[in-house]
Amino acid sequence: AEQLSGKTPLFAGSTGGLLTKANVEEKYAITWTSPKAQVFELPTGGAATMNQGENLLYLARKEQGIALGGQLRKFKITDYKIYRIFPNGETTFIHPADGVFPEKVNEGREKVRFVPRRIGQNPSPAQLKFSGKYTYDA
């Protein structure tokens, strides 16, 4: 299992808390490096002050980690990583899965739902209606 390092951000108040699910099923950790100490919004509500250098924050859901990543991008912090941690201590790296964020171009990444035509070249749904083909297959 990979050992995660970093200090927990400083917050005055509730972090929304980890659910008991975190001890039974899984929890998530997000790590990032900050050039300076600055206040940011927590996805669970409230605000916290991130430390200069490495930061580590545990969250109950993956979506909270993705949301926090969006917050960090406003601070020009793009080196964040999200991990899934199982109750037995096993850690898996989950985002960005292949090391490149989904919105960036990556050589060799398969195109999903790609249709090689302009929108004006789409077939008319009226012509396809009883042909047995779907508009997304034509």
UniProtKB/Swiss-Prot annotation:
Species whose genome carries this gene: Nostoc sp. (strain PCC 8009)
GO cellular component: photosystem I reaction center
GO biological process: photosynthesis
Family label: Belongs to the PsaD family.
Annotated protein name in UniProt: Photosystem I reaction center subunit II
Keywords from the UniProt entry: Photosynthesis, Photosystem I
Function: PsaD can form complexes with ferredoxin and ferredoxin-oxidoreductase in photosystem I (PS I) reaction center.
UniProt xrefs under InterPro entries: PsaD, PsaD_sf
SUPFAM superfamilies per UniProt: Photosystem I subunit PsaD
Secretion signal span: none
